[in-house]
UniProtKB/Swiss-Prot annotation:
It comes from Drosophila melanogaster. PANTHER family: PROTEIN KINASE C-BINDING PROTEIN 1, PROTEIN KINASE C-BINDING PROTEIN 1 ISOFORM X1. Residues 528-579 form the PWWP domain. This is MYND-type zinc finger-containing chromatin reader Zmynd8. It comes from the Eukaryota. One of its GO terms (biological process) is nervous system development.
Length: 1664
């Protein structure tokens, strides 16, 4: 070990002066040195070799002049050193030898300069240091041992002294400050230890710098981590002392320089390396005894690790992570939850203890944290949070919101919450305690978990979401308790969430628009907001929207302009008028207001476009929240009708599409037929069955086309764009159709999704469906819309079509127009382009015709594959030729086509609401079908790729639809590639329109004979890839169009299906084809209903691809206006058959089984344009036999915007399929028409009358699903569940067939319904069919009504229960209010009663006061009550002179006539008072009366006789000023008043005794005392007049009593009116004044002789 810590030269460690770490000892109060950070860096740069293993010391040395001190280091007396020198000493930093820094042995150490040692010794011995060191002697044994070694090293290195001002000195200082790494910690790989040096240096600098702070704390803290030996050796107080001195000594070396080095001394023992080594080892053994073994291992100078370095290292090693601290803190407060799995922390106060668990959620509460405190806690107790959530659905909201839309809105709210300041500080318990969080946190919610729940649609209301967000705050306040920033952030997140939830509840549509559009405020919600002029205090009236009224006094408004929201009093709101209600505004406000009004005008324009009209309200019309609906209707006429149209599009519009999820998970969009229009319209909402059947038809056609197309359709959803759906009244998934509007109780996308298996015929009301679908479309959050848009754009790019501007059909319609034009051009330009354009056209046609379309989603990969396969000349030659033909035809008929297209587009716009096609990648690949189709079509590779053809749904058909006129008449013998398109049943108008369109197209597009090589038997079905062609890819979505009505559904699958050609149905004589064409021509070209019927061409496995041109020519296109009869090349099934099929709205898919002729042309059943008058025209036209070679492209209905029609794959051989399908088609058509065509019936009836239709449907189904080809008459399949023919275990296809078998049931049910409806409503109506149809409708209605009644019952019961609860609550409230009111009234009455005096006898209000708590209403009551009251009367005073009762003495009441000024009036004593004399109070204004004759004239005062009361009790009665007493004296009493007393001006009371019986006379009259006892020292108030009374009762006047009653004999003397003493206080005052008035000298209280008089309240004593 190095001896860097060796003691000074003497080696006497006991006498060495202890030095604290990092500093020399000094008493000089120099300023604290500034340790610059540069010293840290400088050290590393300049002296990388210096190791911190040696402590560097500052050595105090005197300037060179004072270096002569050589006293022994052992001497500590201050005499050896000059005090002044100690003050001038400089502190030099001693550095270890650089070269030997890492060596633990002192062999290479140089000797310390003697002069330096002497200087150090002299400084140590200074008196100042001695005084300083006295308290720290215990540290000597350890702290002075490092200096000699350092001195030696420093001397050898030539760096004994170095100024701290130099950079090198700063480095050394930092080295000294730096703590050495503990020997127990292995050294880092770097030998220089620069890394940890720098850290320790920085730590040392921070710990050493503060001067004002108590260093004892820091050092004591470090000391606490020392080992036991260190703590024993070094007491804490010495450490504190050393720390105090540090800041002073550090600055001593500021002025020291290298020039001041003294000569070396060689007589130091420390120079002996052996001694230094032993000494150091000894000290280290004592200090670091427990680490000796570790020190032995370190040979790089780390052996002598300092105590403080050890302390710091220990601290760092034992530092706890925040997670551990949180775990320990939670463990301290944790208590078991009330129930396992519940929250152990109170939801309110976040404390543990005795908690009450909620029965609905995991929250727990203290009983005292729940309000009200009287809550009953039992097993069914629900916490306040759960109560709020349960009440959420009952709260009135402006608009309902679907779960999907709510999820989308909540995602916006979550994004806003994530941007709250400090939200990143909210840690999830999962992050902190990934393994043990469940113990403390039962619901660790984070933003990620919220996002996942939102995606999963877990929240049914905003209250649920807010309740979940509160868990974030709850967990954060528990996990980071005491962290103010976390608390603020959590509160801010909850606040933002609450605000967003309120906004969502206020108006979901506005909230969605606000987060998705910059122009959201001018858009019109489905339920428009009322426009107001609203005024906030301090602001002018401002235009605003009324978002809703929270109560009857405040309105929630949003102002135009900055879109601020506020609650405005109702009284400050006026309906929006054209005239500004502001009287005047400032210039700035006027400018801003003008801008806002412009925005309002834009909004009003939107309202007019959506609602149709807007009326300004009259000037200053008050807004009434209770009349909001009426006011809204007044301002926006027809607004509620528009809302109803949106909510129930099926009932309002002629065309409806039923979107149904079929058994194969395919979403089918089906037109509802007009059949049973009356019934179905009523049924529309209740009976989606027909539509479902149509949907099934779609799927069937799809099956004909390809299984893959079905799969694609499975995942498709039709969703209206959220933005437009909100604003567009027509954006409904259900396309409105007159006849089937009711039928369309189309299952909305929701329904389809919800009912995947399914075959519910009546899913939901059309209105509900539309709503749900609308919401779904919205809700399929923007992401789906974006996906659709992207997909559509990609698809459009792929197909060469313009990308649809929006997923909505309206936009798609525009796109379709463009696409159609493009398609037409493409078709004209190139056959290769034509397939794509044809597909577009087919979509357009479908849209125009408003026929049922199945939207099939094809995964993008599959789409690409399909396109590739299409590129491969798999497509039947028919498809390409039609394209070629189409160009020709287009050239010829472009003008017609353009006109027709325009008309069709207009129709589409009118009919089809915006539909957003939601694309979802189908799990099932279309590749199989594509592959199958491709092999089948491969022989036809010469032809356009199947997909292209199919995309064109025989592009030819689509192209013709796009440009029906251009094509020349389809060549009768040219085989048409038939794309199986299932048509929905069309209403008559629609059918006529479709027929006309088809006929036009047929005329315009001459069917080009495409010799189709006999397609491989069912493999062509695999043309399902071709379906890709027939199925138009919009984005990733493909739409298969199914027109059930068109029996001859043109299966352009020929294009898809490897050139499935229209093959005349075998059973149907082809000769009728001419008839068919005439019929077609006959059909009115313009059909009343815009729906064009698309001919269903059954595409059989395409035969060897015929020349594309031929196929194109064969494609028959019926223009809506063009009735050009398309005569199938050779044999067309009887037109009647086809028409009948169309009329029945059944989708008849003739199956071409490998007939060569059929192979050349897939059977196309052209549907003649329907006449508005009748469907017979349909019967006339039979598309089935239109030349078998005619490509099925014949009149493909335009797909819904962006929808592509998958061609129906032909089963087995085209011939067989044609034959089979032909017969069924004929039979079915005849059955539908109600007339059996001879040919068809003969062919189709053969075995089972049902077989033909069923066989056709089954064949289509099988083709659609891609199952093996059907037998001509699959009786087994029809008569069994199919398990024998296609056992589910046979393979995946068979399994799928089995699983989807119920689709056939649905399909046939719908077909039968349509058949019945057609038969009942046709020209030759069948009564039984009508009865059956009506019965069916009746059953549906009954079920629907039952359901409605049940709903009403349930709703009414709920309402009644709620009303009952409300009434009970109201009853309780009213009772409580009444009780409170009664209690208040009672208290008030009691108070009033207390304020009044009540008669002690009769309890009436008392006017006369007797004594305390005794008053009377009148004298009789006093007399009656006196016997009981006399004993306790406060007036009773023992008589001064008893008067015997035998002495009769008449009462003489001296009359007083004194002015109110208290002038005494002489009252003559009345000798003979008359009994009738009245007692009167003298009026104050009366002049004084002359003295009576009886009175001694010499006296100024009237003679008054004082009657001293005997011992009998007396009653004191307080008389009001207005009270007069009648005299009751029976005998005349004469008694001169002997001694009048000073008058009591305030006396208003009289003492009354019960009236004696007439026989009793007054007792002897005793003269009153002139000096009655003065009970109070007060003098009477002379200003108060004395009231005199004529008392009718014998009155005993007590001289001591304060009251006097004077009886005036017969004549009334004017009396001074005194104030009536009505109040007890007046009485008490009078009483005291009367007592005080007794004055022996009769002294006058006033200088005025009249004012001064003796007490006139002479007491008259009466005896009973």
């Amino acid at each position: 070990m190095e001896s860097t810590d060796s003691s000074d030269s003497s080696g006497d460690s006991l006498k060495s002066i202890p030095r604290p770490d990092f500093e020399a000892l000094s008493a000089i109060g120099s300023p604290q040195p500034q340790l610059q950070s540069s010293s840290l860096d400088g050290h590393v740069e300049m002296e990388p070799v210096i190791m911190p293993s040696k402590r560097q010391k500052y050595i105090v040395s005197a300037p060179p002049g004072s270096a002569n001190c050589s006293s022994n280091s052992s001497s500590s007396s201050p005499s050896n050193i000059n005090v002044g020198s100690s003050l001038t000493m400089k502190l030099t930093k001693v550095q270890p030898q650089q070269h030997q820094a890492k060596s633990s042995t002192p062999n290479n150490k140089g000797k310390v300069a003697k002069e330096m040692v002497a200087l150090q010794r002299s400084h140590i011995e200074s008196e100042v240091l001695s005084n300083f060191v006295t308290g720290v002697s215990k540290l000597k044994s350890r702290k002075s041992r490092y200096v000699p070694g350092n001195l030696a090293t420093q001397a050898v290195g030539g760096e004994l002294s170095r100024s701290l001002n130099t950079s090198s000195e700063n480095e050394n200082k930092s080295l000294k400050v730096a703590l050495k790494r503990s020997s127990s910690i292995p050294a880092p790989i770097l030998d220089s230890d620069d890394d940890w040096q720098d850290e320790d240096i920085a730590w040392g600098v921070t710990t050493c710098r503060p001067r004002g702070r108590s260093m004892a704390f820091e050092d004591g803290e470090r000391l606490a981590n020392l080992n036991a030996e260190d703590r024993n050796i070094v007491p804490a107080y010495s450490m504190a002392t050393r720390c105090r001195s540090r800041s002073k000594t550090l600055s001593l070396s500021n002025s020291w320089s290298n020039d001041d080095k003294g000569p070396r001394r060689s007589n130091l023992r420390s120079e002996n390396e052996e001694f230094a080594k032993k000494h150091n080892a000894f000290l280290d053994r004592i200090i670091h005894d427990d680490r000796e073994s570790e020190l032995a291992l370190n040979t790089s100078g780390e052996g002598e690790s300092s105590l403080f370095s050890d302390a710091s290292d220990t601290k760092t090693t034992t530092a706890k992570t925040p997670e551990e601290e949180a775990a320990e803190r939670l463990a301290l407060i944790y208590e078991e939850p009330p129930t396992p799995g519940w929250d152990p922390f109170c939801w309110k106060c976040r404390g543990c203890g005795k908690l009450m668990p909620c029965s609905k959620c995991l929250r727990s509460f203290h009983s005292y944290c729940v309000r009200p405190a009287t809550t009953k806690f039992d097993s069914s107790w629900k916490c306040p949070e759960c109560q709020v959530i349960e009440a959420a659905p009952k709260r009135l909201r402006r608009n309902g919101v679907s779960v999907d839309l709510l999820s989308q809105l909540l995602s916006f709210a979550l994004d806003r919450m994530k941007h709250v300041r400090g939200a990143h500080k909210l840690r999830s318990p999962l992050e902190v305690f990934p393994l043990t969080y469940k113990k403390f946190f039962v619901n660790p919610v984070s933003f990620e978990s919220l996002a996942q729940c939102i995606r999963n649609g877990a929240y049914q209301s905003t209250d649920e979401f807010l309740s979940e967000v509160k868990w974030i705050q709850h967990n954060a306040l528990i996990l980071d308790a005491g962290d103010a920033k976390v608390e603020q952030a959590s509160k801010a997140v909850v606040k933002v969430c609450r605000q967003e939830a309120n906004e969502i509840d206020t108006c979901p549509e506005c909230y969605l628009n606000a987060n998705s559009s910059d122009e959201w405020f001018v858009k019109v919600c489905r339920h428009p907001h009322l426009l107001l002029w609203a005024k906030l205090k301090g602001f002018p009236y401002w235009p605003a929207k009324a978002m809703g009224s929270s109560n009857s006094t405040l309105v929630n408004v949003r102002f135009f302009g900055k879109h601020d929201r506020a609650f405005v009093p109702v009284k400050d709101c006026f309906l929006y008028s054209a005239q500004n209600p502001n009287t005047q505004t400032s210039r700035r406000s006027a400018r801003d207001l003008a801008e806002c009004i412009r925005e309002v005008e834009i909004h009003i324009d939107h309202i007019k476009r959506k609602i149709g009209a807007f009326n300004y309200a009259p000037y200053r019309t008050p807004y009434d929240p209770l009349e909001e609906q009426q006011q809204l209707e007044q301002m926006m006429p027809g607004v509620y009708a528009a809302i109803d149209r949106e909510l129930e599009p099926a009932n309002k519009t002629p065309l409806q599409f039923l979107i149904r999820k079929t058994a194969d998970d395919k979403l089918s969009i089906v037109k509802k037929t007009k059949a049973t229009e009356s019934g179905n319209e009523s049924d529309q909402s209740p009976s989606p069955t027909k539509k479902l059947s149509e949907v099934d038809v779609v799927s069937v056609t799809g099956s004909g086309c390809s299984d893959h197309s079905n799969v694609k359709s499975n995942n498709y959803e039709v969703i209206s764009r959220s933005g437009e759906s909100l604003t567009d009244s027509r954006c409904k998934v259900l396309l409105k159709r007159k006849s089937l509007a009711a039928k369309i109780v189309a299952e909305s996308v929701e329904t389809s999704e919800a009912v995947a298996p399914k075959r519910k015929h009546s899913l939901s009301d059309a209105s509900f469906t539309s709503e749900s679908s609308e919401h779904k479309r919205k809700s399929k959050h923007a992401r789906k819309q974006h996906d659709n848009q992207d997909n559509q754009i990609e698809e459009a790019e792929k197909t060469g079509q313009e990308p649809p501007k929006s997923p909505t059909i309206s936009k798609q319609n525009e796109n379709l127009r463009d696409e159609e034009n493009v398609i037409e051009n493409a078709a004209n330009d190139t056959s290769s382009a034509s397939p794509v354009s044809a597909s577009v056209v087919s979509v357009v046609e479908l849209v125009r015709r408003r026929q049922g379309v199945t939207i099939t989603k094809i995964p993008r990969e599959q789409q690409q594959t399909a396109e590739d396969t299409a590129a491969v000349p798999i497509p039947l030659p028919t498809a390409p030729p039609p394209k070629q033909n189409i160009p020709k035809g287009n050239e010829a008929a472009n003008p017609k086509q353009s006109d027709v297209e325009r008309q069709q587009e207009q129709l589409i716009k009118k009919v089809i609401p915006f539909i957003e096609i939601k694309t979802e990648v189908m799990s099932e690949p279309d590749d199989e079908g594509i592959e199958e189709a491709s092999p089948a079509n491969q022989p036809q590779t010469d032809q356009v790729p199947l997909q292209q053809e199919t995309i064109t749904a025989q592009p030819e058909s689509q192209m013709p639809a796009a440009a029906p006129a251009p094509q020349p008449k389809p060549v009768d013998n040219a085989p048409f590639e038939e794309v199986r398109i299932k048509e929905e049943i069309l209403s008559e108008d629609e059918m006529e329109t479709e027929q006309s369109i088809v006929s036009r197209r047929l005329k315009s597009v001459p069917p080009m004979p495409l010799p189709m090589p006999p397609p491989p038997p069912l493999p062509p079905r695999e043309e399902s890839p071709a379906t890709a062609d027939s199925v138009r890819f919009v984005g990733d979505t493909t739409i298969q169009r199914v027109s059930q009505k068109q029996g001859g559904k043109s299966t352009d699958t020929g294009g898809k299906r490897k050139g499935v050609q229209q093959v005349p149905i075998a059973g149907i004589p082809q000769a009728p084809s001419p008839t068919h064409s005439p019929l077609l021509s006959t059909a009115p070209s313009p059909s009343a209903s815009p729906k064009p019927t698309s001919t269903l061409a059954v595409s059989k496995p395409p035969p060897p691809p015929p020349p594309k041109g031929k196929s194109a020519s064969h494609l028959q296109f019926r223009g809506k206006n063009d009735r050009i009869p398309t005569s199938p090349p050779a044999t067309a099934p009887p037109a009647t058959n086809t028409s009948s099929l169309l009329r029945s709205n059944m989708v008849v898919i003739p199956v071409e089984q490998g007939g060569s002729c059929n192979a050349h042309s897939p059977m196309t059943i052209p549907v003649p344009p329907l006449r508005a008058v009748s469907k017979n025209t349909l019967q006339n036209t039979s598309t089935g036999s239109t030349s078998s070679c005619v490509p099925s492209s014949v009149s493909m209905p335009p797909p819904l915007a962006g929808l592509s029609i998958p061609p129906v794959a032909t089963p087995t051989s085209q011939e067989e399929s044609i034959t089979n399908s032909g017969q069924p088609v004929g039979l079915l058509a005849s059955a539908l028409n109600g007339t059996a065509n001879d040919v068809l019936s003969s062919d189709s009836i053969p075995n089972d009358p049902i077989t033909p239709g069923l066989a056709t449907a089954l064949s289509e189904m099988l083709l659609h699903t891609g199952v093996p080809k059907l037998i001509a008459r699959p009786r087994g399949a029809l008569r069994s569940d199919g398990s024998q023919i296609y056992p589910s275990q046979a393979g995946p296809v068979s399994q799928k067939l089995k699983e989807n078998a119920h689709k056939i049931t649905d399909y046939f049910i719908s077909v039968i319904e349509d058949t019945l409806s057609d038969m009942a409503t046709g020209d030759q109506s069948v009564l039984q069919a009508r009865i059956a149809g009506l019965s069916l409708e009746n059953e549906r209605l009954k079920q629907h009504y039952d359901r409605q009644i049940n709903d009403l019952h349930r709703t009414s019961e709920l309402m009644i229960s709620e009303m009952r609860k409300t009434l009970e609550q109201e009853h309780k409230r009213v009772i409580s209010e009444l009780r409170q009111q009664n209690a208040i009234e009672l208290m008030r009455a009691v108070e009033e009663a207390k304020r009044k005096q009540w008669c002690a006898n009769c309890m009436r209000e008392a006017q006369l006061y007797c004594c305390w708590n005794t008053s009377y209403c009148d004298y009789p009551c006093q007399q009656l009550h006196w016997p009981g009251h006399s004993a306790t009367c406060g007036q009773s005073v023992p008589p001064t002179i008893p008067v015997p009762p035998s002495v009769p003495t008449p009462i003489i009441e001296p009359g007083r006539a004194k002015a109110k000024v208290a002038t005494p009036t002489a009252t003559p004593s009345i000798t003979n008072p008359s009994p009738s004399s009245q007692i009167m109070r003298t009026v104050a204004a009366c002049p004084s009366a002359p003295p009576s004759a009886n009175a001694s004239s010499s006296k100024k005062w009237p003679p008054m006789m004082t009657l001293m009361n005997q011992s009998n009790q007396e009653a004191m009665l307080k008389l009001p000023a207005t009270t007069y007493l009648r005299p009751v004296v029976s005998t005349t009493m004469t008694a001169p008043v002997t001694a009048p007393q000073p008058a009591n001006n305030n006396s208003t009371n009289v003492i009354m005794a019960p009236t004696p019986p007439p026989g009793n006379n007054l007792a002897t009259i005793i003269s009153a005392q002139r000096n009655p006892p003065n009970y109070n020292a007060k003098h009477p108030n002379p200003a108060m007049p004395v009231q005199r009374f004529n008392i009718p009762l014998p009155i005993t006047v007590n001289s001591n009593a304060p009251f006097m009653m004077a009886e005036q004999h017969q004549k009334q003397v004017p009396k001074a009116t005194g104030r009536s003493g009505k109040n007890n206080s007046r009485m008490r005052q009078t009483y005291s004044n009367n007592i005080n008035n007794s004055n022996p000298q009769g002294m006058r209280c006033n200088n005025n002789p009249q004012a001064i008089r003796q007490n006139q309240m002479n007491q008259q004593v009466f005896q009973p």
